Protein backbone atom coordinates (compact mmCIF):
# COMPACT_ATOMS: atom_id res chain seq x y z
CA UNK A 1 0.00 0.00 0.00
CA UNK A 2 2.86 2.37 0.82
CA UNK A 3 4.52 1.70 -2.55
CA UNK A 4 1.28 2.47 -4.38
CA UNK A 5 0.84 5.69 -2.40
CA UNK A 6 4.42 6.72 -3.24
CA UNK A 7 3.74 6.00 -6.92
CA UNK A 8 0.69 8.29 -6.84
CA UNK A 9 2.68 11.07 -5.16
CA UNK A 10 5.42 10.73 -7.77
CA UNK A 11 2.95 11.01 -10.64
CA UNK A 12 0.70 13.74 -9.25
CA UNK A 13 3.32 15.81 -7.38
CA UNK A 14 0.78 17.36 -4.96
CA UNK A 15 1.69 20.44 -2.97
CA UNK A 16 1.08 18.48 0.23
CA UNK A 17 0.01 15.00 1.22
CA UNK A 18 -1.11 13.29 4.41
CA UNK A 19 -1.13 9.67 5.43
CA UNK A 20 -2.21 7.92 8.61
CA UNK A 21 -1.10 4.67 10.18
CA UNK A 22 -0.77 2.91 13.51
CA UNK A 23 1.83 4.31 15.90
CA UNK A 24 3.70 1.00 15.73
CA UNK A 25 4.92 1.94 12.26
CA UNK A 26 7.55 4.13 13.93
CA UNK A 27 9.12 1.18 15.73
CA UNK A 28 8.45 -1.57 13.17
CA UNK A 29 11.64 -3.48 12.32
CA UNK A 30 13.54 -1.29 14.80
CA UNK A 31 12.54 1.86 12.94
CA UNK A 32 13.88 0.73 9.59
CA UNK A 33 10.46 0.58 7.94
CA UNK A 34 9.63 4.20 8.73
CA UNK A 35 13.13 5.25 7.73
CA UNK A 36 12.61 3.63 4.33
CA UNK A 37 9.28 5.42 3.94
CA UNK A 38 10.84 8.76 4.90
CA UNK A 39 13.76 8.37 2.50
CA UNK A 40 11.42 7.37 -0.33
CA UNK A 41 9.35 10.54 -0.04
CA UNK A 42 12.43 12.69 0.47
CA UNK A 43 13.82 11.30 -2.79
CA UNK A 44 10.59 12.43 -4.47
CA UNK A 45 11.21 16.01 -3.32
CA UNK A 46 9.20 16.24 -0.09
CA UNK A 47 9.94 17.25 3.47
CA UNK A 48 8.10 15.18 6.07
CA UNK A 49 6.89 15.83 9.58
CA UNK A 50 5.03 13.42 11.81
CA UNK A 51 3.19 13.31 15.12
CA UNK A 52 1.20 10.84 17.21
CA UNK A 53 -2.35 12.09 17.87
CA UNK A 54 -4.76 10.46 20.34
CA UNK A 55 -8.33 10.70 19.06
CA UNK A 56 -9.87 11.01 22.54
CA UNK A 57 -8.40 14.54 22.78
CA UNK A 58 -10.03 15.56 19.50
CA UNK A 59 -13.72 14.94 20.20
CA UNK A 60 -13.67 11.17 19.69
CA UNK A 61 -14.87 8.88 22.48
CA UNK A 62 -12.02 6.47 21.96
CA UNK A 63 -8.37 6.02 22.86
CA UNK A 64 -6.97 5.67 19.37
CA UNK A 65 -3.38 6.77 18.86
CA UNK A 66 -2.47 7.30 15.24
CA UNK A 67 0.63 8.39 13.38
CA UNK A 68 -0.17 11.38 11.17
CA UNK A 69 2.48 12.14 8.53
CA UNK A 70 2.49 15.36 6.51
CA UNK A 71 4.58 15.83 3.38
CA UNK A 72 5.26 19.27 1.86
CA UNK A 73 6.84 19.67 -1.56
CA UNK A 74 10.32 21.17 -1.20
CA UNK A 75 9.70 24.13 -3.51
CA UNK A 76 6.89 25.22 -1.18
CA UNK A 77 8.52 24.50 2.16
CA UNK A 78 9.07 28.22 2.88
CA UNK A 79 5.56 29.17 1.74
CA UNK A 80 3.49 26.57 3.58
CA UNK A 81 3.48 26.27 7.35
CA UNK A 82 1.54 23.32 8.71
CA UNK A 83 0.60 23.12 12.39
CA UNK A 84 -1.01 20.07 13.95
CA UNK A 85 -4.29 20.90 15.72
CA UNK A 86 -4.06 21.52 19.45
CA UNK A 87 -5.62 18.78 21.60
CA UNK A 88 -8.54 19.44 23.94
CA UNK A 89 -7.69 19.79 27.62
CA UNK A 90 -9.90 16.81 28.45
CA UNK A 91 -10.67 13.38 27.05
CA UNK A 92 -14.00 12.65 25.37
CA UNK A 93 -15.61 9.76 27.25
CA UNK A 94 -18.10 7.10 26.22
CA UNK A 95 -20.95 8.84 28.02
CA UNK A 96 -20.44 11.89 25.81
CA UNK A 97 -20.90 10.03 22.53
CA UNK A 98 -23.55 7.36 23.19
CA UNK A 99 -26.43 9.58 24.30
CA UNK A 100 -29.68 8.70 22.50
CA UNK A 101 -27.91 6.45 20.02
CA UNK A 102 -30.33 4.87 17.49
CA UNK A 103 -31.04 1.17 17.86
CA UNK A 104 -29.26 -1.14 15.44
CA UNK A 105 -28.16 -4.79 15.22
CA UNK A 106 -25.12 -6.34 16.85
CA UNK A 107 -23.31 -9.67 16.97
CA UNK A 108 -24.43 -11.40 20.18
CA UNK A 109 -22.10 -13.34 22.46
CA UNK A 110 -22.30 -17.09 22.76
CA UNK A 111 -24.06 -18.19 25.93
CA UNK A 112 -20.74 -19.31 27.43
CA UNK A 113 -19.08 -15.97 26.77
CA UNK A 114 -22.10 -14.03 27.99
CA UNK A 115 -21.97 -15.80 31.36
CA UNK A 116 -18.30 -14.90 31.71
CA UNK A 117 -18.78 -11.26 30.73
CA UNK A 118 -21.67 -10.84 33.17
CA UNK A 119 -19.11 -11.20 35.96
CA UNK A 120 -17.02 -8.23 34.76
CA UNK A 121 -17.87 -4.75 36.14
CA UNK A 122 -17.72 -1.55 34.04
CA UNK A 123 -14.07 -0.64 33.52
CA UNK A 124 -13.03 -4.17 34.45
CA UNK A 125 -11.43 -7.06 32.60
CA UNK A 126 -10.27 -10.65 33.17
CA UNK A 127 -8.56 -9.62 36.41
CA UNK A 128 -12.02 -9.21 37.97
CA UNK A 129 -13.01 -12.80 37.19
CA UNK A 130 -12.72 -15.66 39.70
CA UNK A 131 -9.39 -17.40 39.10
CA UNK A 132 -10.86 -20.68 37.87
CA UNK A 133 -13.13 -18.91 35.39
CA UNK A 134 -10.33 -16.64 34.18
CA UNK A 135 -8.06 -19.63 33.56
CA UNK A 136 -10.75 -21.52 31.67
CA UNK A 137 -11.70 -18.49 29.57
CA UNK A 138 -8.18 -17.31 28.75
CA UNK A 139 -6.45 -20.65 28.25
CA UNK A 140 -2.70 -20.28 27.64
CA UNK A 141 -3.02 -16.49 27.63
CA UNK A 142 -3.59 -16.61 31.39
CA UNK A 143 0.04 -17.63 31.88
CA UNK A 144 1.59 -15.28 29.33
CA UNK A 145 3.23 -11.99 30.25
CA UNK A 146 1.81 -8.51 29.90
CA UNK A 147 -1.35 -6.96 31.26
CA UNK A 148 -3.73 -8.40 28.65
CA UNK A 149 -6.25 -5.78 29.75
CA UNK A 150 -8.14 -6.15 26.48
CA UNK A 151 -9.36 -9.62 27.41
CA UNK A 152 -12.86 -9.83 28.90
CA UNK A 153 -12.89 -6.01 28.93
CA UNK A 154 -16.06 -4.13 29.77
CA UNK A 155 -15.84 -0.43 29.00
CA UNK A 156 -16.86 2.19 31.57
CA UNK A 157 -19.17 5.10 30.78
CA UNK A 158 -16.61 7.44 32.33
CA UNK A 159 -13.64 6.59 30.11
CA UNK A 160 -12.96 6.67 26.38
CA UNK A 161 -13.51 3.35 24.66
CA UNK A 162 -10.37 1.39 23.87
CA UNK A 163 -9.35 1.33 20.21
CA UNK A 164 -12.07 -0.25 18.09
CA UNK A 165 -10.97 -3.12 15.88
CA UNK A 166 -12.61 -4.63 12.80
CA UNK A 167 -14.64 -7.04 14.92
CA UNK A 168 -16.60 -6.09 18.07
CA UNK A 169 -15.88 -9.22 20.11
CA UNK A 170 -12.41 -10.58 19.47
CA UNK A 171 -11.11 -12.42 22.50
CA UNK A 172 -7.90 -10.41 22.83
CA UNK A 173 -9.58 -7.05 22.25
CA UNK A 174 -12.98 -7.28 23.92
CA UNK A 175 -15.14 -4.15 23.99
CA UNK A 176 -18.26 -4.97 26.04
CA UNK A 177 -21.07 -2.44 26.58
CA UNK A 178 -20.93 -0.79 30.05
CA UNK A 179 -24.41 -1.86 31.19
CA UNK A 180 -25.60 -4.57 28.85
CA UNK A 181 -23.68 -7.81 28.39
CA UNK A 182 -23.13 -7.57 24.66
CA UNK A 183 -20.78 -6.01 22.11
CA UNK A 184 -21.45 -2.51 20.84
CA UNK A 185 -24.04 -2.23 18.09
CA UNK A 186 -23.16 -1.00 14.61
CA UNK A 187 -24.48 2.49 15.38
CA UNK A 188 -22.65 2.58 18.72
CA UNK A 189 -19.49 1.53 16.92
CA UNK A 190 -20.06 4.35 14.43
CA UNK A 191 -20.71 6.92 17.19
CA UNK A 192 -17.47 5.90 18.92
CA UNK A 193 -15.70 6.56 15.61
CA UNK A 194 -17.57 9.93 15.50
CA UNK A 195 -19.64 9.12 12.40
CA UNK A 196 -22.97 10.99 12.19
CA UNK A 197 -26.10 8.86 12.58
CA UNK A 198 -27.02 9.72 8.98
CA UNK A 199 -23.99 7.88 7.64
CA UNK A 200 -25.04 4.58 6.07
CA UNK A 201 -22.94 1.42 6.03
CA UNK A 202 -23.61 -1.44 3.65
CA UNK A 203 -22.89 -5.15 3.44
CA UNK A 204 -23.22 -7.84 6.07
CA UNK A 205 -23.05 -7.05 9.77
CA UNK A 206 -19.42 -8.17 9.98
CA UNK A 207 -18.56 -6.08 6.90
CA UNK A 208 -20.13 -2.99 8.48
CA UNK A 209 -18.11 -3.47 11.67
CA UNK A 210 -14.98 -3.85 9.54
CA UNK A 211 -15.68 -0.64 7.59
CA UNK A 212 -16.12 1.31 10.82
CA UNK A 213 -13.15 -0.25 12.61
CA UNK A 214 -10.80 0.47 9.71
CA UNK A 215 -11.87 4.10 9.36
CA UNK A 216 -10.08 7.21 10.54
CA UNK A 217 -12.34 8.81 13.19
CA UNK A 218 -14.31 11.59 11.55
CA UNK A 219 -13.50 14.23 14.19
CA UNK A 220 -9.80 13.39 14.04
CA UNK A 221 -9.81 13.59 10.24
Predicted regions and their residues:
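Conserved Class I SAM-dependent methyltransferase catalytic core
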Residues: 1-64, 68-72
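S-adenosyl-L-methionine-dependent DNA methyltransferase catalytic core
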Residues: 40, 66-220
Amino acid sequence: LFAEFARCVKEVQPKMFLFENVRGLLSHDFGRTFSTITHTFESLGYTLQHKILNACYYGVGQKRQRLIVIGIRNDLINKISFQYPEPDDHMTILRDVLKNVPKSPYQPYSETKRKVMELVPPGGCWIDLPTDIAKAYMGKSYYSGGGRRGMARRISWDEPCLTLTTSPSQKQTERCHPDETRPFTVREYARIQSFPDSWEFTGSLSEQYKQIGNAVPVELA
